[in-house]
Regions:
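ABC family nucleotide-binding domain
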Residues: 2-182
Length: 182
């Protein structure tokens, strides 16, 4: 089953074309790596797929929902806000610099979105967050703050935070986890 389909995606920043006619398909269960030198558009592609950047042209379908429904003069025409929200909930992303909330504990960083976005009860969100912390080997750090963690620990908290929203299809990462690089 196709979970992500990108057809002829292009992205321009004024006159600079960063992505040109990118097409790909990702099936359920597949792991895909986007590899290239600095400045080649990897992050821009991920940002476009996660709706952080406006696509100039092309078509994107995630879990059967079309993100792009037409083409305007200088940019793609997006689906309704309701469809885009549904799509966004299906995609998990760990940012390159992790983007943890510095004023929140590890546990609060992980539970904030499930409580606010998914409307989960606080106790359920905390229980699930603790299970995720155990999976990433940080069960003893739930009361710590991001500044008290190493870079690798911050990355694992960020992974747990993305997984806490139960993305259905795939997990976009801008860099491989630090623990896989040795």
């Amino acid at each position: 089953m196709v979970m992500l389909k990108v057809e002829n995606l292009s992205k321009k920043f004024k006159d600079l074309e960063v992505l040109k006619d990118i097409s790909l398909e990702v099936n359920q269960g597949e792991v895909v790596a986007i590899i290239g030198p600095s400045g080649s558009g990897k992050s821009t592609l991920l940002r476009c797929l996660n709706q952080f950047e406006q696509i100039t042209s092309g078509k994107v379908t995630i879990c059967g929902d079309d993100m792009i429904v037409g083409q305007g003069k200088n940019e793609a025409i997006y689906a309704s806000k309701q469809i885009l929200k549904k799509i966004r909930l299906n995609v998990g992303m760990v940012f390159q610099n992790f983007n943890l909330f510095p004023h929140l504990s590890v546990l609060k960083n992980i539970t904030e979105a499930p409580i606010r976005v998914l409307k989960k009860p606080k106790e359920q969100a905390q229980q699930e967050a603790r299970e995720l912390l155990k999976k990433v080997g940080l069960e003893s750090k739930e009361k710590s703050y991001p500044c008290e963690l190493s870079g690798g620990q911050q990355q694992r908290v960020s992974i747990a935070r993305a997984l806490a929203l139960n993305p259905k299809i795939f997990f976009l990462m801008n860099q491989p986890p630090l623990w896989t690089q040795s």
